[in-house]
Amino acid sequence: MEPKTKKQRSLYIPYAGPVLLEFPLLNKGSAFSMEERRNFNLLGLLPEVVETIEEQAERAWIQYQGFKTEIDKHIYLRNIQDTNETLFYRLVNNHLDEMMPVIYTPTVGAACERFSEIYRRSRGVFISYQNRHNMDDILQNVPNHNIKVIVVTDGERILGLGDQGIGGMGIPIGKLSLYTACGGISPAYTLPVVLDVGTNNQQLLNDPLYMGWRNPRITDDEYYEFVDEFIQAVKQRWPDVLLQFEDFAQKNAMPLLNRYRNEICSFNDDIQGTAAVTVGTLIAASRAAGGQLSEKKIVFLGAGSAGCGIAEMIIAQTQREGLSEEAARQKVFMVDRFGLLTDKMPNLLPFQTKLVQKRENLSDRDTDSDVLSLLDVVRNVKPDILIGVSGQTGLFTEEIIREMHKHCPRPIVMPLSNPTSRVEATPQDIIAWTEGNALVATGSPFNPVVWKDKIYPIAQCNNAFIFPGIGLGVIASGASRITDEMLMSASETLAQYSPLVLNGEGLVLPELKDIQKVSRAIAFAVGKMAQQQGVAVKTSAEALQQAIDDNFWQAEYRDYRRTSI
């Protein structure tokens, strides 16, 4: 499923002179040919030498290496993105291992916190509650008419950092950068959006540089009516768009997903994308150990919308492997700050109710307390898999990990909280506490661990292995909805590309250098499943693959021809 080399057709454009140089999607900078410089009134506006994109990328790489901090590197890359998008993606794809953590997690967290301070140039759409009656006009102001993917946030739950107001715009920008870099979706088809509904972050409200609406967050009916106005305006402007909800607070994330997933082609990456990549990782890890996921007992720390979304997808996968729903649910244990979720626990959220354990089934557990802590659960359940989505650092203690290892020779430990400052335990500690026997996957990037002269590669359970392929598959197939089965097909495909499964060694997830290949394979699986489920028009496998090839954008300059407006 490698992309076929295709001759790029000439592009006819009406812009010229300084206007063309200020258009990030079209600007080539020093790579404009002499003929183009004459035809587009660029003579004298650029240095004499005509460069290739690789020469430009090499200069940018040298400049990038001159920056000492990750946030300065992030600012530099964003500046390139805002002046020459083709060069930006060529540079990022040339150095994806180095630059993905800079354009997205963990560095994007700091960029969101400092958004108003480091702001240079507008990108995307800012829709404030004050402008709610101008929603249609705002979307009409977007110059790109053929938007195919929107990532939207309200900035309330940015990574593990909480309410960042309009600073949350850094997340949709970063996410869409990965749709392009990893999934080949043209940047001309993407649109980042932030819904500015105020902020409850007092530090931002007191910051004279803060650029958002200085007001406490709207809530309840006002909030949901505002979001609905946005959804209806999007449907009117781009009826076939894929809409990704990103970093909404727990109280809103699941209700919004449930409300709109059958009204517009949409999904929530924090819930469904995280679940899909985690399940793909667990399928691969289970196969590498010579078994199936359905044979494992799993404990979660964190029972919010993300954790419960992962749990439900695990349950669906283990049912596919032959378990009944009841048996599948009995193998999943959810622990939050109040302890193990049981049917006797008050004030459960709606999405938690199906994930409780029956209290009477726990009467023989080795504890006198009515509240079962994480250590109690690990000691009594003897899990094979421990997953952290708590957003709190250090909660996987040495005592807990050693207790788990006591009963499980090859534990799978996944501290998934972002950014790195919120991780439940570091890979270095987990490897040491399990005498080198744990299989570790994290939510943020970590360097390989060296323990007793042996190198342990650490897989990043990165949603970027999933959502770009889903987006490409939706666009190529013309899917009108994203179903649970489409997400499951993405997980299964990801597991098939595990080096640990294929070779018996290495990472449990593919290397980043292979991410475009993996995204294309996921796109095919997702598109095929969409056709099988009737949410996309059925075609031959060859036609679907051709559609993926045709929609896979490459960071290459096209030849320009002049046309009138």
Swiss-Prot record:
Reaction(s) the record says it catalyses: (S)-malate + NAD(+) = pyruvate + CO2 + NADH; oxaloacetate + H(+) = pyruvate + CO2
Co-factor(s): Mg(2+); Mn(2+)
Keyword Oxidoreductase annotated: yes
Pfam family, one: malic
SMART domains (alphabetical): malic, Malic_M
Sites where the protein binds a divalent metal cation: E246, D247, D270
Keywords for this protein: Metal-binding, NAD, Oxidoreductase
InterPro entries for the chain: Aminoacid_DH-like_N_sf, Malic_enzyme_CS, Malic_N_dom, Malic_N_dom_sf, Malic_NAD-bd, Malic_OxRdtase, NAD(P)-bd_dom_sf, NAD_malic_enz_proteobac
Any one of the GO CC terms: cytosol
Top EC class, one word: oxidoreductase
Catalytic residues (UniProt): Y104 (proton donor), K175 (proton acceptor)
EC number assigned by the record: 1.1.1.38
Marked site (Important for activity) residue numbers: D270
Cofactor note: Divalent metal cations. Prefers magnesium or manganese.
Residues binding NAD(+), per UniProt: R157, D270, N418
GO molecular function: malate dehydrogenase (decarboxylating) (NAD+) activity; metal ion binding; NAD binding; oxaloacetate decarboxylase activity
One GO-annotated biological process of the protein: malate metabolic process
Family to which this protein belongs: Belongs to the malic enzymes family.
Assembly and oligomerization: Homotetramer.
Entries under PANTHER family matching the protein: MALIC ENZYME-RELATED (PTHR23406), NAD-DEPENDENT MALIC ENZYME, MITOCHONDRIAL (PTHR23406:SF34)
Descriptive protein name: NAD-dependent malic enzyme
